[in-house]
Amino acid sequence: MVFLKVDCSKLFIFLCCIMSITILSFSLVFPYYESDFIIVNHTDIRNNTIVINKEFHQFQFFGTYFYDINRFEMKTSFNQAYLITKRVSYDSYDSSTKNSVFQIITSMTLTSLIAKVFPIPILIVNMYINLQKPKRRYLNQIQQHHNNNNNNNNNNNNNNNNNNNNNNNNNNNNNNNNNNNNQNNNNNDNNDNNDVLDGANEVVINTMPTYEVLMERYQSSASYYLITQLVVNGVSFMITLFSTFVVTHRISITMKLLTSIDEQIFNKPLCYTKNLDPFGYCNSFIGFSSTTSDENFMDFSWGPSFGWYLSLCSLCLDSFSIIVIIFLIITEGKLKKPKQPHKFTNILNLSDMDLINYRLLTLNQRIGTD
């Protein structure tokens, strides 16, 4: 089995890129799900001042923790408006695990995506080169044979003309000698033409095995690549699918701990540190009210985010690659070694003139062997 030839320098650069992206992905965090909702608090403060506090929250779930981006709009009865935006990170589990499982899965997803896309241009280039080389070599030999044939014909014509001139200038030869000379010249011409055809047969004999060997090498290397890529895509598909289920399950646990989606009520209070909350309240959310109850919880919605779409793209790419590779393996099994010479012309995709010349050459070859 023949392996694909890969330049060591290019392979080293590719491995460095993969390692760099893997390391970089550990510093990146892509949310899998996002939740948007609004909380409106009506609070009575001293001097009978009513404060309407609207909290616009966006929770981005990362599997083991989430990130709260909230925006406050406060409006008092004296038409005093305030707008405050804060970003708060809240860990529903142990803080030591929040940067491990999720970022490993993210790194695996990014690395697998690049590793699956990068070899595709290499296969296309190799396929084009391997298919074009034998065709060009064969056409060049046919063109060279045509040039040699034309040169031989010109030489023969010149020799015939010289012989005819010599025969015409020689008054001592009789008609019988002239006839003999003409017959000899014709025999010589026929012998020359036979030599040309023998050379054409040598072109076919030398060219077709070369093309056959190159096609066998290409098919062997392509088969090795296809089978290897099929195994890689299959394993990557299973790992990505498993990791997606794991992350989704962790997100659902986080949602159940914090909220009741059906009732749209948060079950667990979020206690932020005093550094983030200047008032130091352990409220359901950061707020400026003195109560822990939320009178209105509305516009709740949550759905997939960038990390989930990244996993989905990886799964779709794996599925598409597996289907295409299986199709190529099935169709490649039909590309057996040609038994008849004319089948090579279908693979070479020659022009009509080259096809006619090739058939004439193979016909002369069969006549010569018979």
Swiss-Prot record:
Comp. bias intervals (Low complexity): 147-194
Membrane topology: Multi-pass membrane protein
Region named Disordered: 145-197
Top-level taxon of the source organism: Eukaryota
Cited InterPro entries: Integrator_complex_assoc
Transmembrane spans: 11-31, 104-124, 227-247, 310-330
Keyword Membrane: yes
Record key words, sorted: Membrane, Transmembrane, Transmembrane helix
Location of the protein in the cell: Membrane
Recorded GO CC terms: membrane
PANTHER family: FINGER PROTEIN, PUTATIVE-RELATED, INTEGRATOR COMPLEX SUBUNIT 10-LIKE PROTEIN
Protein name in UniProt: Putative uncharacterized transmembrane protein DDB_G0285049
Annotated source species: Dictyostelium discoideum (Social amoeba)
